[in-house]
């Protein structure tokens, strides 16, 4: 997998804010690899997480322009830190190697409604890429991956 740039935005929740953000990506010619929008602990505020493939020189300039949008509270380009995805892969048939891989990758093997095995695993994008490669002999019928979850890490605070 190519290196990804992850941008995290905190936004107010009015209609159209996501469309304005996406329009800026388009105008800058930056391709979105994945996009996720979710609620935050703060009512009325959402987090938009966007990944782009490769290192684009224009991403920092794009972040600067996104900061100027009315409903944007914060923009951060995330480097390092914690990045996780979820992979769900349906296989044609079970195989002895499947359960060894599940143990190795700390994955779960489930059964789909049609009886086919389904592998569920969370991990870094690179880990899931490696698992998919190793699952190839098990005949991957289809798979789905979530977008990168990459919380902006701040110094720990006391919670008690």
What is each residue range found by the language model?
Residues 1-6, 10, 14-45, 51-86, ...:
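Long, contiguous binding/interaction regions
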């Amino acid at each position: 997998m190519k290196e990804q740039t992850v941008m995290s935005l905190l936004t107010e929740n009015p209609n159209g804010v996501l469309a304005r953000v996406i329009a800026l990506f388009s105008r800058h010619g930056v391709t979105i690899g994945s996009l996720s929008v979710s609620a935050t602990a703060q009512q009325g505020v959402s987090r938009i997480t966007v990944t782009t493939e490769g290192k684009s020189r224009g991403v920092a300039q794009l972040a600067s322009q996104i900061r100027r949008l009315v409903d944007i509270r914060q923009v951060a380009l995330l480097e390092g830190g914690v990045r996780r995805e979820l992979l769900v892969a349906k296989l044609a048939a079970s195989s002895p190697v499947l359960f060894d891989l599940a143990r190795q990758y700390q994955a779960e093997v489930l059964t789909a409604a049609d009886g086919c095995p389904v592998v569920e695993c969370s991990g870094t994008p690179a880990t899931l890429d490696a698992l998919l490669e190793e699952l190839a002999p098990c005949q991957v019928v289809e798979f789905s991956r979530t977008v990168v979850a990459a919380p902006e890490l701040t110094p720990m605070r006391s919670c008690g």
